[in-house]
Amino acid sequence: MAPVPPDDTVEIAVRTFIPSDAEGISILIRRNYDETYHKRFVYDPDAVRQANETGRIVSIVAHYYETVIGHFALIPAQNSSIAEIGIAAVDPAFKHLGIMNRMFDLLCTTARSMGRTGFYGEAIMLHPFSQRANLRHGMSETAVLLGEVPSTVEIEHRYKDTRRSGAMVSYLLFDRGERSLALPERYRAIIAATYERSKIPFHEAPPTTAAVTPPACHHNQALGIGSIIIDAPLSPQHLELTLVALMSETCAMIYADVNLQRFGNIEETIELLNRRGFFYAGVMYSLHGGEDYLRLQRKNTQNVDEEDLQCYSEFGQYLLGFILEDERRISRFG
């Protein structure tokens, strides 16, 4: 049975995870998402407990007396100094009491104490509320990932889409050291605007040469998406082999991450990706090995929502508009 909302908030406390929270977290996620949340381990209290004990996640918990009514987590990256934030939920009976804000504040403190240089979140675009919360805490929008959210996802039995929905990526960086970047001409202005909004100084690196190298790739079965990591110039043959491998996994979306700091001349790689159906998604800071990447995206299904995505800010709306226009542009390549 769902808890009864309080007359006041005195007994609502926010703290880091203790083992006895695990069962309440699983109950809360089920209450908010039913059985649709893609990180399946959150439905198993033992798995939640183990994930926290091993550092796979760092849970922030809100509780009312002995009942877990809120959850937010840091998900440390394996090969970077940043973390992802996610697995966010507040019991519907306790909405509008500032619980998410309190968890977010402790999340920031915890990330800093762990030595993380920042974090990012992917706000589901079925509603604008997570985007609003992220912006209020100083996060900056950098990308829109079309089709990342499966059509099976449902929030509070209210927010759902028959098509794959999108995610708005936002960052909060504690370390804003100057970057040396290779900016492709096609996307120079919007990448520069993204860095400026994030208050990250940069200068453009002189073009350099690098050997052609096969890209790495990854398949996320839970989300039905694939990713390509490109740290050196890309050949058409390597791209085709990678696409065939990911498409054989029935990836609905494929994201191509192009290193902005590793090799100086990326124009040919960007043109090759455009001709194979990849269009703009945005910038991902400190994504792999602590370096920044330009992310492009490719649709392998028409079941992707582009009309009803919710954007909270003007820049978010501008970013989505740019992405859709770039998709129309590359569609002319056939």
Region locations from a protein language model:
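A conserved beta-strand-loop-helix scaffold within acyl/acetyltransferase catalytic domains
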Residues: 16-92, 218-220, 232-236, 240-243, ...
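Non-catalytic interaction/regulatory modules that flank or connect domains
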Residues: 181, 187-286, 293
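Conserved active-site tyrosine of GNAT-family acetyltransferases
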Residues: 130-134, 273
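Short amphipathic alpha-helix that is part of the acyltransferase structural core
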Residues: 2-43, 53, 61-63, 68, ...
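Conserved catalytic-core motifs of GNAT/GCN5-like acyltransferases
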Residues: 122, 138-160, 279-291
